[in-house]
């Protein structure tokens, strides 16, 4: 289920703790605001005993920090790190080239443990929140057909080529290995829609 709560339109970043009317200054607490969010979305229940968020739900999170190996996001008062491999089905090497602080992203809650009310733990994924769209994209590529893409990563297992937001693992070409970022022509040798993978061979680079 996708959680489209109205609170996302009016985020509470700070709880006002006091106002100095003469100076026109308000004192706020971000930690208190985050505690309120955690209580509302992870701990409180409705009249039927249901929590607002459960594992498997999709919700909107806010990027609060980005480093090369991944991004930190805040989801209703909890900050959680999402590693590079859970940000995209594409083979990225640096998250800072794709995300900025303040970005809004949809995330899928893979795991949610609230057994310790003071230390709620989450496991989140950006790429799995868009899994259906990725399946539609990957299904457009037919085995035997030739497509043009760009090299995004070279590893010990082969060359990753990206086209139309889909990655394809290719065998090392017999000719000189292409450089990262260079355009190449790829023949699709196989597709696995269940595991969301393509593999092929570079026929021109």
Where are the model-predicted features located?
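Single-stranded RNA-binding regions, centering on S1/OB-family and related RNA-binding modules
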Residues: 1-205
């Amino acid at each position: 289920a996708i959680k489209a709560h109205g609170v996302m339109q009016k985020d509470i970043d700070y709880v006002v703790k006091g106002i100095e009317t003469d100076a026109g200054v308000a004192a706020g607490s971000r930690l208190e605001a985050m505690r309120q969010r955690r209580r509302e979305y992870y701990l409180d229940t409705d009249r039927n005993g249901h929590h607002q968020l459960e594992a498997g739900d999709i919700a909107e999170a806010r990027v609060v920090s980005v480093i090369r190996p991944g991004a930190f996001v805040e989801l209703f008062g909890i900050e959680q790190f999402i590693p590079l491999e859970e940000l995209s089905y594409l083979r990225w090497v640096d998250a800072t080239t794709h995300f900025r602080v303040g970005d809004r992203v949809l995330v899928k809650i893979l795991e949610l443990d609230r057994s310790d009310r003071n230390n709620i733990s989450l496991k989140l994924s950006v790429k799995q929140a868009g899994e259906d769209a990725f399946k539609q994209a990957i299904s457009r590529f037919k085995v035997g057909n030739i497509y043009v893409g760009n090299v995004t990563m070279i590893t010990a297992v082969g060359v990753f080529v990206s086209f139309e937001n889909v990655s394809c693992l290719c065998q090392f070409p017999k000719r000189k290995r292409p450089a990262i970022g260079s355009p190449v022509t790829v023949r699709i040798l196989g597709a696995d829609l269940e595991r969301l993978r393509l593999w092929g061979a570079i026929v021109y680079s």
